Amino acid sequence: MDSTELNRVFQMFDKDGDGKITTKELNESFKNLGIIIPEDELTQIIQKIDVNGDGCVDIEEFGELYKTIMVEDEDEVGEEDMKEAFNVFDRNGDGFITVDELKAVLSSLGLKQGKTLEECRKMIMQVDVDGDGRVNYMEFRQMMKKGRFFSSLS
């Protein structure tokens, strides 16, 4: 992931745009994704990432976290984590991410990208290997391993 993509992902979490991700912002972002994490666990996550000790995560700390995750993913992708991420997008549980489901998740995250069905259709087309107009788990997994999801948000 290049610095532009990293900034884009960081901004998804940095809701107020002050250059720092707080526990509250992290909590809100996860809730928007349908992931509930107790506040004490979120605090622990931030403490592990927070190198400068200010209680927040800045872009450099976020970048280091991302590098760590990507190195671990290259060695051994956590299948459970990958399925959990897929299920966030596959809202009806049918095993496919549709244009409508992608739009709903991106909207819930408050992203500028994917506001129209046409934008979401283009994003799906970028990773839809079998051409059925939806993303199955294997296509999603390949996309995530290659880091293509965040580049498709450009």
Swiss-Prot record:
Keywords: Calcium, Metal-binding, Repeat. Ca(2+) 1 binds at residues 14, 16, 18, 20, 25. One of its GO terms (cellular component) is cytoplasm. Disulfide bonds: none annotated. Ca(2+) 4 binds at residues 128, 130, 132, 134, 139. The keyword Repeat applies. The keyword Repeat applies. Residues 1-36, 37-72, 77-112, 115-150 form the EF-hand domain. InterPro entries: EF-hand-dom_pair, EF_Hand_1_Ca_BS, EF_hand_dom, EF_hand_pair_protein_CML-like. It holds the Pfam family EF-hand_7. CDD domains: EFh. Gene3D superfamilies: EF-hand. Ca(2+) 3 binds at residues 90, 92, 94, 101. One of its GO terms (molecular function) is calcium ion binding. Ca(2+) 2 binds at residues 50, 52, 54, 56, 61. Potential calcium sensor. PANTHER family: EF-HAND CALCIUM-BINDING DOMAIN CONTAINING PROTEIN (PTHR10891). Belongs to the calmodulin family. This is Calmodulin-like protein 6. It comes from Arabidopsis thaliana (Mouse-ear cress).
